[in-house]
């Protein structure tokens, strides 16, 4: 194309179109100069990223909102680039420093936020512990029994995630603080447990459930000497194939051992049965079984059922917390991103607790019988715990009193329960002791002592004795819906991200627009009126000029160097080498597993 300028005008003198391509208006949106992200798109991406929504899902939602790809002014790569830029801006001072700044901001918002960072001689982060104010308050009510585990390793530095998990009045898992560790040795666990102990006002839990890790056991004995410590039963039984598969009669050994572990009513029954079991299958030289027997008081149910464990016999509550992070966390996740997702977990758990509180107080689960005792628990317990009580009432139908012995003070009932499991059935005899003068009751199954729920055998005897109201000692305040709990008055988390002034104004205006739009959309006339008003406003010179001025000022502010105070320039941790756990065997998120399959 040739152009000639004549008298302040450009004249086209010739055009050669040999090198031109056909015009394609529909593809013009893909030209880089035509692609852009407006404020609404950026805000959506930011909020979704904070909530842990993956970018591909955020992009799909924007496509649906626009009515198709062809209606967007950007492509998925633009969205990824924007989020990547935002994340880099947040962590430009380094991951370690960013984590410290985040924790410091949390403490400024609530002085009861607790954190400690352990650093190596090079000023790099080694270990981290933190707990928000709500978790600290919740510990005072539900910190009697906790589960602790370190199986989840998905983050940029391969640092194990170590949550302290309790059980609230709805039976929900509740977070009571957590750590990220550089090692899984005794000294590291001692550091973490001491941090947690200081955080909780030097109050130790009454019981703690862990796996068989010797380093954990040593640390617990040192930091929590008066705390009951039990091993995860599920992990032990899961190892049976690995430890016993070499024996020719493995299936028979496995069946006998399971029956011995789960069916032994007393310690004497277990010990005599174990000796017979070892001798019968010639297992005297099996070191693993020998170690298990030496530590039987840590894992065999009949040794542990007399103490309160809130129903916990495994660490699966700790491992269950990992499911929340699945899909949001991967091997490139920074420490700060991990902590943000942890905050999301806190908010999610708190919301579920609020909903369960509301449901328990404002709705009623009908009784399944005419029992006065069932009605008593209906009035006192949360829905979840009352549901457990109702299950015992239903199972009471499988119980029958076979014999009664009175010694002049107390009455001993022999209650036979018909048990059905899959295609097998069996009878189990329980001894229930009832004191007519005090109405106290005690069952050999120890469900009340272990779980805090009156068992079916006791309910059978109470009905036999025509007891219509149980003592308050059998109605645990821990499961009550009538108690106002202090931790529920504390916010679960605080947003430390400081939005730019124009973003705050944008959010404020959007909320106003949504309210007006909801009113206007009720009729066509209202819609037409609002559209006319908006079009008139968009042409208003004062609004356009003010917006341009504000945008220029915003750009000037964005170029201003960060003047935040640095805290000794804390460095990011080094990549952790797993001791005794090969990296290839670490627990991975579903996202990583799918990614590996695609690359095979």
Where do the protein language model's features map onto the residues?
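Short, basic interhelical loop/turn and adjoining N-cap
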Residues: 63-77
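Conserved beta-strand -> loop -> alpha-helix junction used to position metal-binding or nucleic-acid-contacting
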Residues: 76-79, 172, 176-178, 207-215, ...
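Short, charged amphipathic recognition helices of the HTH superfamily
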Residues: 51-62
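Charge-rich, intrinsically disordered regulatory segments
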Residues: 5, 9-16, 50, 67, ...
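Active-site beta-loop-alpha junctions of metal-dependent nucleic acid enzymes
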Residues: 29-37, 156-157, 178-201
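Basic, short loop/linker segments at the boundary and entry of helix-turn-helix/winged-helix-like folds
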Residues: 8-47, 131
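Surface-exposed, charged/polar loop-rich segments
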Residues: 1, 92-100, 104-119, 132, ...
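Structured nucleic-acid-interacting core domains from mobile-element enzymes and related host factors
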Residues: 85-161, 167-168, 288-293, 304, ...
